[in-house]
Amino acid sequence: MRKKQKLPFDKLAIALMSTSILLNAQSDIKANTVTEDTPATEQAVEVPQQTAVSEEAPSSSSKETNPPQTPDDAEETVADKANDLAPQAPAKTADIPATSKETIRDLNDPSHVKTLQEKAGKGAGTVVAVIDAGFDKNHEAWRLTDKSKARYQSKEDLEKAKKDHGITYGEWVNDKVAYYHDYSKDGKTAVDQEHGTHVSGILSGNAPSETKEPYRLEGAMPEAQLLLMRVEIVNGLADYARNYAQAIRDAVNLGAKVINMSFGNAALAYANLPDETKKAFDYAKSKGVSIVTSAGNDSSFGGKTRLPLADHPDYGVVGTPAAADSTLTVASYSPDKQLTETATVKTADQQDKEMPVLSTNRFEPNKAYDYAYANRGTKEDDFKDVKGKIALIERGDIDFKDKIANAKKAGAVGVLIYDNQDKGFPIELPNVDQMPAAFISRKDGLLLKDNSKKTITFNATPKVLPTASGTKLSRFSSWGLTADGNIKPDIAAPGQDILSSVANNKYAKLSGTSMSAPLVAGIMGLLQKQYETQYPDMTPSERLDLAKKVLMSSATALYDEDEKAYFSPRQQGAGAVDAKKASAATMYVTDKDNTSSKVHLNNVSDKFEVTVTVHNKSDKPQELYYQATVQTDKVDGKHFALAPKALYETSWQKITIPANSSKQVTVPIDASRFSKDLLAQMKNGYFLEGFVRFKQDPTKEELMSIPYIGFRGDFGNLSALEKPIYDSKDGSSYYHEANSDAKDQLDGDGLQFYALKNNFTALTTESNPWTIIKAVKEGVENIEDIESSEITETIFAGTFAKQDDDSHYYIHRHANGKPYAAISPNGDGNRDYVQFQGTFLRNAKNLVAEVLDKEGDVVWTSEVTEQVVKNYNNDLASTLGSTRFEKTRWDGKDKDGKVVANGTYTYRVRYTPISSGAKEQHTDFDVIVDNTTPEAATSATFSAEDRRLTLASKPKTSQPVYRERIAYTYMDEDLPTTEYISPNEDGTFTLPEEAETMEGATVPLKMSDFTYVVEDMAGNITYTPVTNLLEGHSNKPEQDGSDQVPDKTPETKPEQDGSGQAPDKKPEAKPEQDGSGQAPDKKPETKPEKDSSGQTPGKTPQKGQPSRTLEKRSSKRALATKASARDQLPTTNDKDTNRLHLLKLVMTTFFFGLVAHIFKTKRQKETKK
């Protein structure tokens, strides 16, 4: 192994910086252990750990395939939360002075929970369970007002219940937290205590009146006892699902009436869950226990920065456990009013104007601050008037943290950033050196900018004020359908800027569907409690079924005022939960089979019918009016706008439902007049959906409604895989932006930031440099023991570098436009295999690769990959934009393990979408196999005067020549370093007299340092020492630098020629024709097609210029490890496991990329000297 060498200053600096970055990344990732509830698009995230970063990225996407949803969308993250998350002793609250006994819900109750509480109580005597990533189990909000009404009166009562059900674990914490257990079995203290604490507070928090907060936290069921169950990914998704399945069973057995699960895995299908988990859901349902889940914060296919393509309508990402039919899955919306911090300004007419603010490091309350306008805060001149004042800055152009840092540097005492979008959501700003900062709406920002009196005062007590966004679905809230093709989410609840408990007796606002779910869980618990008295003859499972249907039926369908249409049922479910309407309901509506309160029509034509059943539980006949809304997706260019498009509404009709009975209603829909235009925008089909709405009077408010969804087309058989990058007309894919100057440029992994870049459908292979091939042939078995400045790298089949520049690769094509994907499976590691990489647009199953010969017979079949998850995002926090499938690697051998004959083969990938009724699909690639060794020149002459080497003949190859070069190797410090010389225009080579090291030292070169290397486009390589060429003996053993024959040669292996085969092995029979239609025995006169750069592989732009490979010399080992790990990325989205794994790879790659940049820059400077 190579000894540790002394690093120059620049290398050392980069190494230290990269190590620091990597360690920070590892720390951050370990803290973020919750799965689906990742950073919300807007202000906060359900898992705010330690310190996060807020990045305001400027609107910059010029590629039509990858536009941001809105300008500057990528920065919506969470600000610093400086809470110490260590476990704390129970809080002492008696000495804290009382400031208010008014609850948060007293001020703002958009879901009307108080009305239901008045009827059903506040959960006394009830047990509720929260399954989450971690809790502060000693928070001050965990208390009961009257312990005598508790289900478990003592620890002994709990122990008896545990014993009755064989539960031997779990602890009694206090009267409120009757049970706590960590099901993760990792033996670690929960890093994230905040998320589960916040969720539990919304469900069942009951803060004391003596709290320091201005208003008291009271959850939906404040008097219920809590079962806190920690579950975290430790050993993969399957084990994770089994752990929370056990928690579900235990919660049911310990008497929970409702279970909240604010976590999950985006885009995963319910069908792929372990059987134990499915049985746990069924068990809870059979016992009448409601499971409420969050829909997730992954928005849609493409994440929060890309809009889904209009050609691919299966863009839903709701995953598990939310995809389970038995769960109630909750989306997030922002109500029109919110409890918020406020600031006051005096307007020109001397009126006080209050405005909502979202602060990081709050300003001193009740103090009048002067402020000055600072444009977008990008340049020094913007801040000329801010010293001693607050800087008022518009959002955009640069990161939030840079705006704040610039203002601080200019002497500002604080920062106010106002939105650059109307009706936007509030954004929590980053903590920059404890600088007071706040975010305000665009409307209020413009008011401040134009106000004559530049003074603002921040108020001490929060108030309820209208939101800038109005009532709107949260942009981060995950869309349905599920991967299985089912309707989710079911219902929506407030999830934007929700104030609740966090660790260490503190309270904070967080956003996400994790905040929406526990509110609905509490309402479900109370509604079932009401039904125990109202419907005593029902079984618990019957009451659960009724409560779910009533809650969905009584939800209010949310309307998008901007689009003049209802938000899609695939985004909001049945609508906004309304506890008051649910509690008072005597009617509800279901599908025609009374299965659920949503209608899934599957595939429909232009004309169809929606049939629903109206149920009347009252003792009187009920007269209602009904109509249906008809809508679809709005399309913006080539993308879904993630907004509704209204088509039309049916006329109001009247119906009477007898007492204690039900009646069906059928609504005919005719959308034929829209089909031509809609198919022009969405060629693969589109959703026709809406709500059947009921009123007691057409002029009054909606009483109840039911969502319906149909797909005009064949949803089950939509394409599951993005077309190969080779077929792209402009060189781009959904996640890949083409080089505008060379659309066929397709760089390999190399030293590039590949993890976020090389995401498309293609075949990968491996490029092995001559030095490594030579070392292996000389007996080095472990590639890690090879000393070389060159590396083995993963590239894409059909791509080739320039002869004198291997920093970029380009697709080379046959005359028919197909890529020249050729391999030579001779064991030298150079283009020996192909492996499938795909960007999946949908979940699929049973992926298998097979190879067919020219007769169509299958010669090889891979192992089956049973589950494939759509590549719904290109984000290290979730999943990459493509997946490499290790099982699909084909080494050019048949099913018996023998190398196939030379020729052209079809490499086929087969897979089936998991949607109901889907048929198998496949994608084909043509692959040339050719093991024919090139025939190189056997003699040459050398002119010492101009140092020109002239070969006696041109190389002869079966495939076109890829590169013909002279290699030379010298020692740079203790690393053998290889560089290449390309031929001059006349075919000669100019040999240098000396080489220059990285430190500027010169190294004399001897003739024995030079080797003639020829490589064809299938990866066959032959090489001959130049000394042998000059003597006219190509098979003479290579001599060392003393011009003496080495006295020892490898004894373990027979001598091999330049083809990588033993001398007694004859070349395989040549194929009749290659993919270009030319006979392979035609020699170099048959020139390959030019690539997109206008050059053929092998043509040299500069005369005799050595090619610089020094940028690779520092990373050979790291890259080998990186490529191997990248090829084995799992096909499931194990976020907790993958995030750390991916970031380690990326940060390592980033480090070597920086090193490469320094090397390359240095060499460029040397070349110019």
Curated annotation (Swiss-Prot):
Segments of skewed composition (Polar residues): 48-67, 1093-1108
PTM statement from Swiss-Prot or TrEMBL: Cleaved by SpeB protease; leading to its degradation. Degradation by SpeB is probably strictly regulated to preserve integrity of C5a peptidase.
Keyword line: Cell wall, Hydrolase, Peptidoglycan-anchor, Protease, Repeat, Secreted, Serine protease, Signal, Virulence
GO biological process: proteolysis
Subcellular location: Secreted, Cell wall
Molecular function via GO: serine-type endopeptidase activity
Any one GO CC term of the record: membrane
Record carries keyword Hydrolase: yes
Membrane topology: Peptidoglycan-anchor
Pfam families, sorted: CHU_C, fn3_5, PA, Peptidase_S8, ScpA_C
Chain location of the short sequence motif LPXTG sorting signal per the record: 1129-1133
Statement: the UniProt record of this protein carries the keyword Secreted: yes
Signal peptide bounds: 1-31
Functional note: This virulence factor of S.pyogenes specifically cleaves the human serum chemotaxin C5a at '68-Lys-|-Asp-69' bond near its C-terminus, destroying its ability to serve as a chemoattractant.
Protein name, per record: C5a peptidase
UniProt gene name: scpA
